UniProtKB/Swiss-Prot annotation:
One of its GO terms (cellular component) is mitochondrial inner membrane. This is Cytochrome b. Heme 1 (or BL or b562) is low-potential and absorbs at about 562 nm, and heme 2 (or BH or b566) is high-potential and absorbs at about 566 nm. One of its GO terms (molecular function) is ubiquinol-cytochrome-c reductase activity. Heme b b562 binds at residues 51, 150. Its cofactor is heme b. It comes from Amblyornis macgregoriae (Macgregor's bowerbird).
């Protein structure tokens, strides 16, 4: 899945760059500029659909990648693992600021709700939120800085990815048995390159099918309405890939407690290498750990379902 994530990143940067050429980061024009891209730009609708659904595929790939890393004990390559968690956090930040850009209802209210969480931080919270907003509510300054961040962060991700790969190159990759595989090494090309191309093809077919046949399947219908600060949508919720965290946030009645739980649900990945006590690296021959692992997966799926 690592190679698929690389392809996702490249695709997102290319489609994003093409979209940015037609986008206007202004509260009065943002929604109209996206509509203009879809209607009047050659293949603008396709580029937008690929970009929007590409984000979903990016998250599908990264969650599978992390799940596999946990299952096979890959987190024992501590530097690789920690840079990977930082990559996940950066990706989540990028997806969040990107979701705000079309300036639909859910964009606006999602931005309002999530940035407002920073006000739960004691003492500096309120100042921090107003500083992030550039005013006393989510408005034009917020949109322009979010566009700047959304343009910048993917290149930051690309940079950290190189660090991630460098650390991986130090140790070599892991395998399902969790034992050294020096004696089984084979040339990257043509073997691994062909294996990766199969993955690319499957990912690409799935993405194109999604973008062409049901591009709005994962989107929120509220986002077809331009942002209106005076009318709150009946249910504010993020895109599906944040629902597990959002469900955790909303299940805790205390604001600060919810924010801490939300942060912990992702940051717990940093602790995993410290919690490994088994003499075996991978879960291949550890039924109890397997049960716990699949319970965790089921838990995430249930949280995602409940969050919506």
């Amino acid at each position: 899945f690592g190679s698929l994530l690389g392809i996702c990143l490249v695709t997102q940067i290319i489609t994003g760059l093409l979209l940015a050429t037609h986008y206007t980061a202004d509260t009065n024009l943002a929604f109209a500029s996206v509509a203009h891209t879809c209607r009047n730009v050659q293949f603008g609708w396709l580029i937008r659909n690929l970009h929007a659904n590409g984000a979903s595929f990016f998250f599908i790939c990264i969650y599978l990648h992390i799940g596999r890393g946990i299952y096979y004990g890959s987190y024992l390559n501590k530097e690789t693992w920690n840079t990977g968690v930082i990559l996940l956090l950066t990706l989540m930040a990028t997806a969040f600021v990107g979701y705000v850009l079309p300036w639909g209802q859910m964009s606006f209210w999602g931005a309002t709700v999530i940035t407002n969480l920073f006000s739960a931080i004691p003492y500096i919270g309120q100042t921090l939120v107003e500083w992030a907003w550039g005013g006393f509510s989510v408005d034009n300054p917020t949109l322009t800085r979010f566009f700047a961040l959304h343009f910048l962060l993917p290149f930051v991700i690309a940079g950290i990815t190189l660090v991630h790969l460098t650390f991986l190159h130090e140790t070599g990759s892991n395998n399902p048995l969790g034992i050294p595989s020096d004696c089984d090494k084979i040339p990257f090309h043509p073997y691994y390159s062909m294996k990766d191309i199969l993955g690319f093809a499957l990912l690409f077919i799935a993405l194109v099918a999604m973008a062409l046949f049901s591009p709005n399947l994962l989107g929120d219908p509220e986002n077809f309405t331009p942002a209106n600060p005076l009318s709150t949508p009946p249910h504010i919720k993020p895109e599906w890939y944040f629902l597990f965290a959002y469900a955790i946030l909303r299940s805790i009645p205390n604001k600060l407690g919810g924010v801490l739980a939300l942060a912990a649900s992702v940051l717990v990945l940093f602790l995993i290498p410290l919690l490994h006590t088994s003499k075996q690296r991978s879960m291949t021959f550890r039924p109890l750990s397997q049960i716990l692992f699949w319970t965790l997966v089921a838990n995430l799926l249930v949280l995602t379902w409940v969050g919506s």
